[in-house]
Design a protein with these regions (language model features):
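Aromatic- and charge-enriched surface segment that lines or borders ligand/interaction sites
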Residues: 94-146, 178, 270, 317
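Ligand/substrate-recognition segments at binding pockets and active sites
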Residues: 26, 234, 378-450, 493, ...
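Ligand-site clamp/hinge motif
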Residues: 212-218, 243-289, 406, 419
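Gly/Pro-rich hinge or "lid" segments in bacterial periplasmic/extracellular proteins
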Residues: 82-83, 174-175, 185-251, 255, ...
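Surface-exposed binding/hinge segments that line
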Residues: 108, 131, 140-141, 145-205
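N-terminal lobe/hinge region of extracytoplasmic solute-binding protein
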Residues: 33, 46-101, 137, 144, ...
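Append "and occasionally in soluble cytosolic enzymes with long acidic Gly/Pro-rich linkers
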Residues: 239-242, 318-411, 415, 476, ...
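Extracytoplasmic/peripheral linker and loop segments enriched in polar/acidic and small residues
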Residues: 31, 38, 337, 415-430, ...
Length: 567
């Protein structure tokens, strides 16, 4: 912990992370060159990140590029979360009321918020209550004409049993919307503040319906965000143009290019040569290079995330919690901290990060005791155990090097006589294959843009999350689920804390997954990039990003104008 604080201080001083979704259409560029770099340093910046894009609609994404990078650029939500105070703040809803002891929520919408004008849609009206009703009815109403479009899967909200929880969402007038729940839910506002809850254009949906092109709603996005989609080249880059009608004011940069074309050391090389202006999720092993280069800056924030190893609890012998405990004892977590995170993470004792208000301070990190592992396996009569470990290939905010992590776990288990076969998987392919339940172990993680513990518990480990394809452990415990429901129904923070701590003790005993690390969020960027905000909950808007020379030029022009006014 001390080393972690020292690293945070040093970086602060230097600077003062497609089967269910059909293939995406690739919008043609509008009056722009097909190569992303020629004029970008004068008219925008390049953001380098790894990831696979399966949808532009955050409602249909489970994590990754859409949530971590694109959502805050293309869309807005009813509510936001302040990245510094962790409190809810107004967004498209300028105010709200909690009624009926948390069973009714009424939102008063902003007026004069325009939707983006794109090559595929020109709006004729501003955002209103019809758009909010459309956006949420599509998710929870199975009879809605857009519910089944592009697969009908909404992983985050499905994991929360959103369709079973919401009784209705109604337009009271053009700028007032009311949600009625079937039971009080203290976490409801927090879920609406996540990037999974964008407001879509109902008018755009109507136009697509008339054209018979409904599937384009998730492929050619229209939102109210600061940037709009101009061009997408699969596996190469995404170009965004600023929204000249953005309701918060004109974004500073005319365009942003999101470079998808390189990973690992390739992205670092691009940053060092100036081909990238911002490097998302640099590997912790690259920190010394980044810190020592005077042309670069680093930002670091605590992250609301967890990396974990999930056990397929429906597959023998992992359906026996004693086997899961034995495997956990054989993993050298301190070596993971040193070899993967280089001091940029805390060893996790719970799926909740330590920053969570419901974190159980009595939680203990699983000890490293391979001899005890051998004894347990011998007692159970288990020999020559072979396991398949499914591993995502792309770096994530919670794990910068998944494949290397898997190799270290493989080596640890080999020491206790367990053979591990590493199976690399990517994107939605990973989710689809995991739902076949043919895996034994999977290395994964979770990050959230909510400060409510429910954003970790239900998506990862509720019974409903098995169907929504986010519960990779395939673990279902009625007692655990009941504790989560009690926490949701309570409006008393102390009671919610107690329920969530009881839930954490069940997880410690049953161990459907092994928490590994809660990682700090890292971002590296060129010295002349200013206004870049790194949030614990995911990426913030790029609307305020600018180059230092642009500011100097603006000040110079203003000075010249002032000089001209002098007598």
């Amino acid at each position: 912990m001390r080393a972690l604080l020292i690293l945070m201080l040093s970086i602060w001083m230097l600077s003062l992370a497609c089967l269910a979704t059909p293939a995406l259409a690739q919008p043609a560029p509008a009056a722009e060159p097909t190569q992303p770099l020629p004029d970008i340093r004068q008219r925008g910046f390049v953001y380098c990140v790894s990831g696979i894009l399966n949808t532009f609609n955050p409602q249909m994404a489970s994590s990754g590029l859409t949530i971590d990078t694109l959502a805050a650029q293309l869309y807005d939500r009813l509510l936001d979360v302040d990245p510094y105070t962790y409190r809810l703040s107004p967004e498209l809803a300028e105010s709200w009321q909690v009624l009926d002891n948390g069973a009714t929520y009424r939102f008063h919408l902003r007026k004069d918020v325009p939707f983006q004008t794109t090559d595929w849609f020109t709006p004729t009206r501003k955002m209103n209550a019809d758009d909010v009703v459309f956006s949420f009815q599509r998710v929870f109403d199975s009879q809605h004409p857009y519910h089944e479009v592009n697969g009908g899967e909404y992983p985050y909200f499905d994991s929360l049993q959103f369709a079973d929880a919401v009784q209705s969402v109604k337009k009271l007038d053009d700028y007032t919307v009311e949600f009625k729940l079937k039971a009080p839910d203290a976490s409801f506002l927090w879920h609406l503040a996540t990037h999974y809850a964008p407001i879509l254009s109902a008018e755009y949906a109507d136009v697509l319906t008339q054209q018979g092109r409904q599937e384009q709603i998730d492929r050619e996005p229209v939102g109210t965000g600061p940037f709009l989609l101009n061009e997408y080249r699969s596996g190469q880059y995404i170009r965004l143009f600023r929204n000249s009608d953005y309701w918060k004011g004109l974004p500073r940069m005319p365009q942003v290019v999101i470079d998808l074309g390189a990973g690992g050391t390739g992205r670092l090389s691009k940053l060092l040569t100036g081909e990238c202006d911002v490097l998302a999720y640099p590997a912790a092993s690259q920190l010394s290079i980044l810190r020592d280069d005077p042309r670069l800056r680093l930002t670091l924030r605590p992250g609301m995330n967890v990396a974990y190893l999930a056990f397929n609890t429906r597959k023998p012998p992992l359906n026996d919690q004693r086997v899961r405990q034995a495997i956990a004892l054989s993993i050298n977590n301190q070596r993971l901290m040193q070899s993967i995170y280089y001091g940029t993470a805390e060893t996790a004792a719970s799926i909740l990060p330590r920053a969570s208000w419901a974190y159980d301070n009595q939680a203990q990190v699983t000890e490293y005791n391979p001899e005890k592992t051998k004894a347990i396996l011998k007692e159970l009569g288990i020999t020559k155990l072979q396991l398949n470990l499914w591993v995502p290939t792309a770096s994530q905010s919670y794990n910068p090097s998944p494949l290397k992590t898997a190799e270290l776990i493989q080596a640890d288990l080999a020491q206790v006589g367990i053979t591990v076969n590493i199976v690399p998987v990517e994107g939605r392919f990973q989710e689809a294959r995991l739902m076949e339940m043919s895996h034994d172990l999977t290395l994964s993680g979770w990050s959230t843009d909510s400060n409510d513990p429910d954003s970790f518990f239900r998506p990862l480990l509720s019974c409903a999350a098995i169907r929504s394809q986010t519960n990779y452990a395939h673990w279902c415990d009625p007692e655990f689920d009941e504790l989560l429901q009690k926490a949701l129904r309570s409006q008393q923070l102390s009671a919610r804390i107690e329920y969530y701590q009881q839930a954490q003790r069940i997880l410690e005993q049953q161990l459907p997954l092994l928490p590994l690390a809660s990682s700090l969020r890292l971002q590296a960027y060129r010295y002349d990039i200013k206004g870049l905000v790194l949030s614990p909950f995911g990426n913030s808007s790029f609307a305020g990003v600018f180059r230092e020379n642009q500011l100097q030029e603006s000040q110079s022009h203003q000075s010249n104008r002032d000089e001209g006014k002098k007598p």
